[in-house]
Curated annotation (Swiss-Prot):
A Pfam short name: GreA_GreB
Any one Gene Ontology molecular-function term assigned to this protein's record: DNA binding
Coiled-coil residues: 43-68
Alphabetized PROSITE patterns for the sequence: GREAB_1 (PS00829), GREAB_2 (PS00830)
Lineage, top ranks: Bacteria, Pseudomonadati, Pseudomonadota, Alphaproteobacteria, Rickettsiales
Family named by the database record: Belongs to the GreA/GreB family.
Record keywords: Coiled coil, DNA-binding, Transcription, Transcription regulation
Protein name (record): Transcription elongation factor GreA
InterPro entries attached to this UniProt entry: GreA/GreB_C_sf, TF_GreA/GreB_CS, Tscrpt_elong_fac_GreA, Tscrpt_elong_fac_GreA/B, Tscrpt_elong_fac_GreA/B_C, Tscrpt_elong_fac_GreA/B_fam, Tscrpt_elong_fac_GreA/B_N, Tscrpt_elong_fac_GreA/B_N_sf
Gene Ontology BP term (one): regulation of DNA-templated transcription elongation
Function recorded in the entry: Necessary for efficient RNA polymerase transcription elongation past template-encoded arresting sites. The arresting sites in DNA have the property of trapping a certain fraction of elongating RNA polymerases that pass through, resulting in locked ternary complexes. Cleavage of the nascent transcript by cleavage factors such as GreA or GreB allows the resumption of elongation from the new 3'terminus. GreA releases sequences of 2 to 3 nucleotides.
GN (gene name): greA
Length: 161
């Protein structure tokens, strides 16, 4: 069973979802099934079928989250440091073409969210950045072609989820 990195904040978020599913959603689905059963014939009972489908979804998500949390290697980013980019880094880059600054946080695959500038350690941009230092030029293959960036800053700080 392979381990994978995740920030401590990302892990807490997954654990919170898991607890909610186990203690709130699971109970609600059971109540929905019991209520639908009370309506009689189950063979043509749309409410019953919908409740059973939701139960299957909830149970699958619980199993998935249990697997993820069991394999997680929790990393406290605030305790990291260094001059090169690794998991947990917050990196500021300058796009060589547009000269615009962009910032990315390198996180685990289950906490990535590009709208919040959190990129997975397995993403092309993160793979290109790993091991680089301030002043290095990084080339990243994108759907629009190769993009070139200069590394401006590297920080290790807690993320807010």
């Amino acid at each position: 069973m392979a381990k994978f990195p995740i920030t401590d904040q990302g892990f807490e978020k997954l654990e919170h979802e898991l607890k909610h599913l186990k203690h709130v959603e699971r109970k609600k689905v059971s109540e929905d099934i019991a209520e639908a059963r009370a309506h009689g014939d189950l063979s043509e009972n749309a409410e019953y079928e919908a409740a059973r489908e939701k139960q299957a979804f909830v149970e699958a998500r619980i199993k998935h989250l249990e697997d993820i949390t069991a394999r997680a290697e929790i990393i406290n980013v605030a305790k990291l440091s260094g001059d090169s980019i690794k998991f947990g880094a917050t990196v500021v880059l300058i796009d060589d073409e547009t000269e615009e600054e962009v910032m990315y946080h390198i996180v685990g695959e289950y906490e990535a969210d590009i709208t919040k500038k959190r990129v997975s350690i397995a993403s092309p941009i993160a793979k290109a950045l790993i091991g680089k230092s301030v002043g290095d030029i990084v080339e990243v293959m994108t759907p629009g072609g190769v993009k070139s960036y200069e590394v401006v800053t590297i920080k290790y700080e807690e993320l807010v989820f």
